[in-house]
């Protein structure tokens, strides 16, 4: 009886091993589903448009409930930290810029917001009087920016015949953390306001130029 039990146990282990091997071979034989460039553009345009709407909502709520009118006369609105990133400023420049150069520009914008948005979420979460909706949208803005960035990088890599190991990207540094963490309420709120204002502007750029690129790449400029 004891020998029979031992053999049964060994047989069971062998059966499980074979089953696992067959399962692994079956999974390995299935090709990874590759999202087409066209579908990536469609998804990214949808994501960027929805993110812009949320950014506009957050900006509007902050402007109504927290912004101070005295800022308009007492403070000078600083340039956004992404101001140095070149993007087309008119229809002629849009027509002339290469696809990979425009992709590079909006990738630079998206990357430059990774760090600021982390701190923005913390600031909005801790902001007395901020609505639950505002807090949730701030988190969504951060998360969607990362999703958009990932998709942009995939598309960019597909435009290259050979992707260089040290691709020439220029990510502007953000220097607003000190003001954002300031104990002075006015300075702190003004820093949040500028993040709201600048991200709304930048995600609008990303959304606009993604639509330009989709028109060019997917619809062959017939849109």
Curated annotation (Swiss-Prot):
GO cellular component terms attached to this protein's record: extracellular space
Coiled coil: none
UniProt signal peptide: 1-28
UniProt KW NAD keyword: no
Cellular compartment(s): Secreted
Listed Pfam families: Hormone_1 (PF00103)
Family of the protein in this entry: Belongs to the somatotropin/prolactin family.
Descriptive protein name: Prolactin-3D4
Organism, scientific name: Rattus norvegicus (Rat)
């Amino acid at each position: 009886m004891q020998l029979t039990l031992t053999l049964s146990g060994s047989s069971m282990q062998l059966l499980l091993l074979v089953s696992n091997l067959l399962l692994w071979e079956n999974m390995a034989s299935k090709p990874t589903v590759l999202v087409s460039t066209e579908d990536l553009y469609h998804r990214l345009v949808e994501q960027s448009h929805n993110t812009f709407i949320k950014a506009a909502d957050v900006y509007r709520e902050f402007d109504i409930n927290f912004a101070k009118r005295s800022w308009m006369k007492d403070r000078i609105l600083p340039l956004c930290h992404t101001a140095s990133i070149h993007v087309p400023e008119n229809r002629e420049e849009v027509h002339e810029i290469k696809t990979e150069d425009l992709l590079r520009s909006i990738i630079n914008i998206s990357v430059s917001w990774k760090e600021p948005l982390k701190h923005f979420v913390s600031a909005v979460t801790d902001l007395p009087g901020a609505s639950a909706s505002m807090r949730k949208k701030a988190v969504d803005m951060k998360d969607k920016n990362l999703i958009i960035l990932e998709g942009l990088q995939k598309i960019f890599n597909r435009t290259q015949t050979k992707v260089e190991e040290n691709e020439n990207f220029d990510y502007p540094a953000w220097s607003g953390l000190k003001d954002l963490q300031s104990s002075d309420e006015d300075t702190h709120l003004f820093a949040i306001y500028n993040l709201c204002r600048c991200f709304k502007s930048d995600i609008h750029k990303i959304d606009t130029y993604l639509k330009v690129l989709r028109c060019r790449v997917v619809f062959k400029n017939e849109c």
